[in-house]
Every structure is written in C-alpha cells, then in structure tokens.
C-alpha cells in the first residue's frame, strides 16, 4: 500500500492506494504495465475524483487508477485549456463537416442500439484485443457504472425520414463533469464510414461544451508519444501535460520524457512511496 505524498491530505487522506500485479501493456506491444489503484471506490465522489484527475488518475467504471509502471513514464496525463484552445484548419473543417449532428446529453443508461454500435466499433477498431467480445455486463461495468457526475452523449444525424427516427446514431461519448472541467471517458462511433474524423469532432465538441459551462479544462486521459493510437490528442493545442507532478504546456515533438526502454531495466517509477 502506498500513500503518494504529492496528493493533498484532505479529502484524499481517507483513501488507500495499491499497486496492481504486472500485466501486459495495452498501449505498447511487448511492455509490462502496472497500475496504482485508489480505494475504496464508495469514497470517491465527484469532488474527490476531481482531485484525483488533477493528480493523473482516470477511471474505468468504478475502478480509479493511474499508471505505476516500473521505470516507464510513457503515459502522460493531458488536458486542453479551453480558453486558450486554437483549432487548426483540419479541426475547423471537421467541425463544419459534422455541424448538423444533434448531441443529446443524458444520464448513463443502457440502450441496445448503443451496445450494438459499441460492438461494431470494437470489432472494426480493436479486433482480437478482447473488447470485441465484451458481453452486455462487461459493457455496462466499463461504461455505465459511475459514482460521480457522469453523462452519456448521443450524436445523431438530423431526422430526414420517419423510418430513421429518432435519427441515425453515429457516435456515443461518455464524459465526467469535474469541478474544473470535463473528463473524456470513452468514445465510440460508426466505424464503417470513411474519412469521418468523428473522434476529432467529439473532442472539439467537448471543448465547446466546457466553454459553455465555464469550465477551464478538458481532460483527455493519457497521451503516449510512441503510440500511433494516441497521436490525435497532440493535435489539440495548447496541450498541457502532468510532468513530475506539475501541469505544464507540452511540445509533443520534444517533450522531455525518459525513453520507454528504461522499463526493461526494472527501475522503479518516479513515484514516492
């Protein structure tokens, strides 16, 4: 059990932090990962979770964690400062392209249409990774269980024909509402349409939603320089990262991080016990 001294004493002092056993890294092939888990989950309300996110934690269902890998700091928590965000030409084009999508914000709930879209997305984007075989229970545990202020956002095309009512579903996004921003939990979308850039549109939408709520940040989870799947996050500028316990503006092309190869030497992570 560890109590990271970079975390404030209250209200996080009631939590305990445990390191998991090593497991295969889901981001970098051939790597071994570990996580640090915050428990008990019933004490992690929205205020506590806001502080945890500031310290680099994320959640999967009611499981709250952050990377705790031996000698590797490849996973960088990142966020976009809303008032400073400047969309590039590609992002503006995507925003205009999908401007007709209708977003509906709702409490977390199960819907068979959502689950079917999730399975199509996993089969197309992550075939063989395990999530393409998720049962309904696994889907609900992953995305629909939360003890904090969470929302499900539907993105549909405008209703053009009664046969398509209530409009063709294109994307689902789960977000958490924090004290200082929105946290992007997970997004999945229709995978069979070419050149849609739904993911880019979704982040842009979250930034504009945070702006309308007068929230200063959108937290995007972890960015990994060596992972092509994470590259899109670096396109949102300015991008801030949590480096050595402090949030600072990142230059994704030259951010000073230890090489991931340090992991093979068994060095301890840069976290104090």
Swiss-Prot record:
This protein's GO CC annotations: cytoplasm
Molecular-function GO terms, alphabetical: arginyl-tRNA--protein transferase activity; leucyl-tRNA--protein transferase activity
Reaction catalysis annotation: N-terminal L-glutamyl-[protein] + L-leucyl-tRNA(Leu) = N-terminal L-leucyl-L-glutamyl-[protein] + tRNA(Leu) + H(+); N-terminal L-aspartyl-[protein] + L-leucyl-tRNA(Leu) = N-terminal L-leucyl-L-aspartyl-[protein] + tRNA(Leu) + H(+)
Cell compartment(s), UniProt: Cytoplasm
InterPro entries attached to this UniProt entry: Acyl_CoA_acyltransferase, Asp_Glu_LeuTrfase, N-end_Aminoacyl_Trfase, N-end_Aminoacyl_Trfase_C, N-end_Aminoacyl_Trfase_N
SUPFAM superfamilies linked to this entry: Acyl-CoA N-acyltransferases (Nat) (SSF55729)
KW Ion transport (keyword) present: no
GO biological process, one term: ubiquitin-dependent protein catabolic process via the N-end rule pathway
EC number(s) per entry: 2.3.2.29
A Pfam short name: ATE_N
Keywords: Acyltransferase, Cytoplasm, Transferase
Keyword Cell membrane: no
Top-rank taxon: Bacteria
Protein family according to the UniProt entry: Belongs to the R-transferase family. Bpt subfamily.
Function: Functions in the N-end rule pathway of protein degradation where it conjugates Leu from its aminoacyl-tRNA to the N-termini of proteins containing an N-terminal aspartate or glutamate.
Protein name, UniProt field: Aspartate/glutamate leucyltransferase
The organism of origin for this protein: Paraburkholderia phytofirmans (strain DSM 17436 / LMG 22146 / PsJN) (Burkholderia phytofirmans)
Organism phylogeny: Bacteria, Pseudomonadati, Pseudomonadota, Betaproteobacteria, Burkholderiales
